[in-house]
């Protein structure tokens, strides 16, 4: 879990830190976009605008690249029935995703892919409903029966139909905005108590340190929302495939939680199967709790 969380946070921190540094350099050279006043104070409105630009540009850049990044990170082989000959199993997978997508009201079918892994898992990603991807592991296709596979696919299609990637991006943009804003307020306060000649370098280092600390705190909000959206996708999957198939899929996944790979941090929040035990930094709730909620529906 620690490695996954570290990589997830690091990727987000690197994006907003890089953008922040670039904009700061541009501001210092041109005077455009700087948030310091003439007497060394802070222009709160200018800083808030600066923070929003950094925060939302970073999150939307990640969204636009999400499908490509997932393919690269997971080694996804996209199945295209119009350009290649598919095996019976591959064609069946594509047909199921298309059937569920039409039932969910999607006007453009998602890309369908397979990635080579013993883990029993699947994920959905993409910048919009019209540019989405549903991918499953070879382990899932080998271990699960047809009803369980359909339940898993319905869950992933529900994520796309619900627009979860865009919503997560907006939330991450808001969190990033506050991280950038308060990191610079705190760094400015620290730089005021050191010698004047040291203030610029202290401010620069303090911004990075506070940005890391506040990003960790802000990630708690993102992870909490990620757990919340899993319940919605479960309900959506039950509507598409049937409640019994969705519950059967989750029960089947319980048997394979030990196989869930944690190194693909960039798509951890997108997968249907998380780790067995939930913590504040978990992207998924306990499977047993998800099953109980569906049964009570």
Swiss-Prot record:
GO terms for biological process: proteolysis. Binds 1 zinc ion per subunit. Zn(2+) binds at residues 155, 159, 230. Its cofactor is Zn(2+). It is found in: Cell membrane. Its EC number is 3.4.24.-. The keyword Zinc applies. It is an enzyme of class 3 (hydrolase). It is a multi-pass membrane protein. One of its GO terms (molecular function) is metalloendopeptidase activity. Pfam families: Peptidase_M48. Keywords: Cell membrane, Hydrolase, Membrane, Metal-binding, Metalloprotease, Protease, Transmembrane, Transmembrane helix, Zinc. The chain crosses the membrane at residues 5-25, 44-64, 170-190, 204-224. One of its GO terms (cellular component) is plasma membrane. The active site is at residue 156. Belongs to the peptidase M48B family. This is Protease HtpX homolog. It comes from Bacillus licheniformis (strain ATCC 14580 / DSM 13 / JCM 2505 / CCUG 7422 / NBRC 12200 / NCIMB 9375 / NCTC 10341 / NRRL NRS-1264 / Gibson 46). The gene is htpX.
């Amino acid at each position: 879990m620690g490695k996954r969380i570290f990589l997830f946070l690091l990727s987000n921190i690197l994006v907003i830190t890089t953008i922040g540094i670039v904009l700061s350099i541009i501001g210092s050279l041109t005077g455009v976009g700087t948030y310091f006043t003439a007497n060394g104070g802070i222009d709160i409105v200018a800083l808030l605008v600066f923070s929003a630009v950094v925060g939302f540009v970073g999150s939307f850049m990640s969204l636009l690249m999400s499908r490509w990044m997932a393919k690269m990170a997971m080694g996804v082989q996209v199945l295209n029935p119009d350009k290649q000959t598919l095996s019976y199993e591959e064609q069946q997978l594509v047909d199921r995703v298309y059937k569920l997508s039409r039932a969910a009201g999607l006007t453009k079918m998602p890309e369908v892919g397979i990635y080579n892994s013993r883990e029993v898992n699947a994920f959905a990603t993409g910048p919009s409903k019209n540019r989405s991807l549903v991918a499953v592991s070879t382990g899932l296709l080998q271990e699960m029966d047809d009803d369980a596979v359909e339940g898993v696919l319905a869950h992933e299609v529900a994520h796309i139909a619900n627009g979860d990637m865009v919503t997560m991006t907006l939330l991450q943009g808001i969190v990033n905005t506050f991280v950038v804003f308060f990191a610079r307020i705190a760094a400015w306060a620290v730089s005021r108590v050191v010698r004047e000649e040291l203030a610029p370098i202290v401010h620069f280092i303090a911004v990075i340190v506070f940005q890391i600390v506040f990003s960790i705190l802000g990630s708690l909000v993102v992870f909490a929302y990620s757990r919340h959206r899993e319940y919605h996708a479960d309900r959506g999957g039950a509507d598409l495939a049937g409640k019994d198939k969705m519950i059967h899929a989750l029960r089947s996944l319980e048997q394979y939680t030990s196989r869930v790979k944690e190194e693909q941090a960039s798509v951890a929040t997108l997968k249907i199967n998380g780790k067995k035990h939930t913590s504040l930094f978990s992207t998924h709730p306990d499977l047993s709790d998800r099953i109980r909620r569906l049964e009570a529906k």
